[in-house]
Amino acid sequence: MRHTSRITFLVAGLLATTGVLAHHSAVAEYDLDKPVSISGTIKRVEWQNPHIWYYLDVKEKDGGLSEWGVSGGAPGQLMRRGITKDVLQVGAVVSVEGFRARDGSKNMTGRRVTFADGRDVFTAGPEQQR
């Protein structure tokens, strides 16, 4: 009986780990072979776990505005690199390089953010540092 309990516990642990790894896989959500670059104005910032999100108003070719969601690394990871929530200010004009969502939505994982004054920061998590 004790042996069966250990095996059950081991299998349950392995299954739980698979879900966690799938959630944190950039490859699952974003096409890392298709880089994208957008420019716009930061509309809002959500600085919370497990990943920060910031949203840009992006001017389309037809003159209209569309909202793009940009996923970044975890707040703790970013703060260890000196990037605080004060860096991404609402109203700032930025260009963002990253990878578009696989589902074709106007979401992306942001890697490099370049500000109008030429400063840039790397907002992606460590899994995207390639």
Regions found by a protein language model. Name each.
Residues 1-9:
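Bacterial N-terminal signal peptides that target proteins for export
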Residues 48-58:
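Short aromatic-glycine-enriched beta-strand elements
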Residues 80-96:
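Short nucleic-acid-contacting surface segments enriched for D/E, G, S/T with interspersed K/R
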Residues 101-125:
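OB-fold/S1-family single-stranded nucleic acid-binding modules
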